[in-house]
UniProtKB/Swiss-Prot annotation:
Pfam families: Zn_clus. Residues 308-325 have a biased composition (Polar residues). It comes from the Eukaryota. CDD domains: GAL4. Keywords: Cytoplasm, DNA-binding, Metal-binding, Nucleus, Transcription, Transcription regulation, Zinc. The keyword Zinc applies. GO terms for cellular component: cytosol; nucleus. One of its GO terms (biological process) is regulation of transcription by RNA polymerase II. This is Uncharacterized transcriptional regulatory protein C2H10.01. GO terms for molecular function: DNA-binding transcription factor activity, RNA polymerase II-specific; RNA polymerase II cis-regulatory region sequence-specific DNA binding; zinc ion binding.
Length: 480
């Protein structure tokens, strides 16, 4: 039996690259430069790296910066100073001897850094010698000050800053323009702002009269609106009526100092002023120069010059002497607005015209469509204007030949009456043939409506139910 003499196994400290990747044991060769046994069997290239993975591991060394003279400058130990202000020792490190050192780099050849502040032998920055010496804590390199400071105001336009530290000399310290000034931390003031002190508000010179937001409103005196009758009517002093100027147009209102004893006097004065303004502002128009606008207790109504003086229900009279006097021309402009043939008709009765315009005698159907009915509960005062065309239309309807059934008003109990047939219904019934018309019988069962049923505050639903119940109890024969 033969025995192989392989020799002792050689152990290497570093494996080849192939064995390291395969994580197998690498046995080196006795001859330098020869591959290992594993690579020889595999006929692979055996390569040993010059720098192994263990060589990459470096032990932790103290931070140092290379110097020009080849020496190593080790960082000095920091002095343990308590943090008494927002500017702690981390922002401004100090050595054990109390001198200020650089906060960024500590190399002698690092002057290219813009944030680097070179340190002199005395331990202070040359660019901040004058500014740091003005502070009591930094004078003659005595180290940081022990009293916490609180900046009051930092002005961006000037380099002066006032601080409250309890000393008068520190309040007037002057800081030079430097990068350190922009890096200072400004802490908020712990004292609240005194809003009642005169220093917290701008002076009177800064307040301009043209600025509405900064100007202080003046007090308004209501003594001009006081009157002897204001004791009985307190609302007249609180809400004074505006006096309308008579010489201007409609838009030029002037606040007057007159007061009125009640609301009716105020309305009467304002309506008179509006009527006078309307007459003066329309005098330059040639088409309206023939009319005379007269003011009364209410709005003055413009009526036709050809109408009778008693036909106007609002109280406006027609001045026949002033017709064709203001215009100065012979052309009758009223012929373009009205139909003169209907007014000058010989068959037209004056009593019919008077009855059609008299609201007190015949309130049903005599209300003009353009007439405004206001204040029904107090006095049923009618205000408005009547044109020339409306006068001729009412004159045609009052002739007794044609005319639709006018709308009835249920606001007052006096307007509803069933004791006599309506004349409008009889006039319309005369147009129908006799065989299709049943004579309307007057109702004597109900003379007038109950005043409690209809009032000025009655809704439409209440009137509807009342009429429906009344029709069921009293049927009315109608024409088909």
């Amino acid at each position: 039996m033969t025995q192989k003499n392989t020799g002792p196994r050689r152990r290497t400290a570093v494996a080849c690259d192939r064995c390291r990747r395969r994580k197998i044991r690498c046995t080196g060769s006795d001859i330098p430069g020869q591959p290992c046994l594993a690579c020889q069997k595999a006929h692979a290239d055996c390569h040993f790296s010059t720098t192994s993975w263990r060589a990459c591991r470096k032990k932790s060394a103290p931070l140092h910066c290379p110097s020009t003279n080849g020496k190593t400058n080790v960082l000095p130990s920091y002095a343990s100073t308590p943090s008494l202000s927002p500017m702690t020792s981390s922002h401004f490190p100090y050595a054990s001897d109390g001198t200020l050192i650089s906060a960024t780099n500590h190399c002698d050849d690092c002057s290219y850094n813009p944030h680097y502040l070179p340190v002199n032998s005395n331990g202070s920055s040359p660019s901040h010698t004058s500014s740091l010496d003005s502070i009591p804590g930094y004078a003659s390199g005595s180290g940081p000050f022990k009293t916490p400071y609180r900046p009051v105001a930092v002005s961006e336009s000037s380099s002066r800053s006032s601080f409250s530290m309890g000393s008068s000399e520190f309040a007037s310290s002057t800081w030079s323009q430097s990068p350190m000034q922009s890096s200072l931390y400004v802490s908020p003031s712990s004292q609240p702002l005194d809003r009642f002190s005169p220093a917290s508000f701008p002076s009177k010179e800064t307040l301009t009269s043209s600025s509405l937001s900064s100007s202080v409103p003046r007090s308004v005196s209501l003594s001009n609106f006081a009157d002897s009758n204001t004791s009985n009517y307190p609302e007249s002093s609180l809400l004074p009526a505006a006096k309308v100027g008579n010489n201007g147009f409609v838009g030029s209102n002037v606040l007057g100092s007159m007061s009125y004893s009640n609301v009716e006097d105020s309305v009467r004065f304002q309506t008179d002023s509006v009527s006078q303004m309307s007459s003066k502002s329309l005098e330059h128009l040639p088409m309206l120069s023939e009319m005379t606008l007269s003011s009364s207790a209410s709005f003055g109504a413009s009526v036709s010059p050809k109408s009778t003086p008693g036909s106007n229900s609002t109280g406006a009279a027609v001045d026949t002497n002033s017709v064709h006097s203001n215009g100065g021309s012979d052309l009758d402009y009223s012929s373009y607005l009205t139909d003169s043939s209907a007014v000058d008709s010989p068959s037209l009765d004056a009593d019919e015209v008077l009855r059609s315009f008299n609201l007190a005698n015949d309130p049903i159907g005599a209300v003009d469509p353009l007439t405004l009915e206001i204040d029904q509960g107090s006095g049923s005062q009618l205000l408005g204007q009547q044109s020339f065309a409306n006068d001729s239309l009412n004159a045609k309807q009052s002739s007794g030949k044609l005319g639709p059934l006018p709308p009835q008003s249920f606001n007052s109990s006096d307007y509803i009456s069933f004791d006599e047939p309506s004349r409008y219904l009889s006039d319309d019934a005369s147009l129908w043939p006799d065989q299709y018309v049943d004579k309307v019988q007057p109702l004597a069962t109900m003379k007038t409506c109950n005043p409690a049923v209809f009032s000025s505050n009655t809704s439409l639903d209440d009137m509807f139910f009342f009429i429906r119940d009344f029709d069921e109890d009293h049927p009315i024969q109608t024409a088909y």
